Amino acid sequence: MKKAKGIAKSVAVASVIMSGSLGIQATSAFADSKGTVENLQNGGKVYNSFKTTYDMKQNIKNSIKVSFIEDPYADKKIAIVTTDGSNIDAKYTINSGYYNAGLKWPSAYHTEAEITSSDSAQFHKAAPVNTMTSAKVTSEVGYTLGGSVKVGVNDKGPNADASITGSFAWKESVSYDQVDYKTVLETHTDKKLNWKVGFQSFNFPEWGIYNRDSFNTFYGNQLFMKSRSYNEGTNNFVSKDTVPALTGYGFSPNVVAVITADKTESTSDLKITNRRISDQYNIEWVSSKWWGTNNKDTYNEFFTNNYKLDWKNHQVTLDNQKALEEQMIGINNVNNQLNKGKGKLSFSMNGDQLKATSSNAGYGISYEDENWGIFVNGEKVYTFNEKTTVGNISNDINKLNIKGPYIEIKQI
């Protein structure tokens, strides 16, 4: 590779330019679909309710279908939740450079479900379960009047069907593709579920099979390295059309959760998060050859929605008030931690916008060299140091017009 006059270094995390009134926010939209009703034999009914939201900044779509089963023979209320229609973009992003360059790529996707109300609602069953390594994962749920729920998941390759048998009053099947990734249900309790779909390996025809930990004495990790000794940095990554589809383009999770509740319940609270964990793969020109390193779990970006399950009216609705309440709990905890020096800095929410106020503006929070980050849906948008004057910090934050509802402030 020919030498250049200057050496361009890759930057893993972009900094924020603080000028004007730049807005940093979770730009989202939502859509309602009219519900449908299915009549079951012997008197039962299934009420289907849909909700779709989209976060533009993270390019994540949360879509859920809730099937409320009205069964006169069951002693519980039952809802089947699927994430059919959801999508998490890969954000396969190259950081330009000549002698140094970086690639942000998704090493794992998560779909998380949590019942946040302190009522009788609980996760009765879920699918898929255990570890799924097939290229296509198909889950099936069947319901028999009287409250019997059966779920099944394929484990026999990309063309296999989910394996539940029997006579059912109602049945549904969902699936997703995960070539070169595998599914693990990491959390499976009565109130929380967490599916992880993690990267396994990539078979690049030029060099062979590589994973996140691959190492070569001469070239380091060649995971997404196109050439060992040619190309400028920016052009020396494997294209998104060559890597696995989940790596280059994104993932469409489609999982199943069965929720039961006492007959006396009127509403329950549900939270769904779709998350993207990304590594930073860097290459550096060293001694006439490329050297690759893979930094794990560098980015944690997500999109969360709070929902209200209306058992009486068989509807799922967005619960924005719940999201703001959770937001304020976190902000109040941060305010308590920052209230320790002469310079006072505190945060509040004005609607969905983060506001900062200060007193003794010419002083810092402390004399300690401690950094804090402000994150929106997991993406860092601002950093401040405890030694910086609180007046400058609050002015910067208010100019940025940071909007939630999922804002996190934490030490970094």
Give the residues covered by each predicted segment.
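Bacterial Sec-dependent N-terminal signal peptides
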Residues: 1-11
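Membrane-insertion modules used to breach or fuse lipid bilayers
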Residues: 131-187, 226-295
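Short, aromatic- and glycine-rich surface loops/edge beta-strands on solvent-exposed regions
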Residues: 266-282, 392-411
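Solvent-exposed serine/threonine-rich low-complexity stretches and specific carbohydrate-binding patches
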Residues: 378-389
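Amphipathic, membrane-active segments
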Residues: 180-233
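Short beta-strand elements
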Residues: 281-333, 410
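Sec-dependent signal peptide cleavage junction
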Residues: 20-41
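Deployable pore-forming modules of oligomeric membrane-permeabilizing proteins
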Residues: 34-144, 183, 201-208
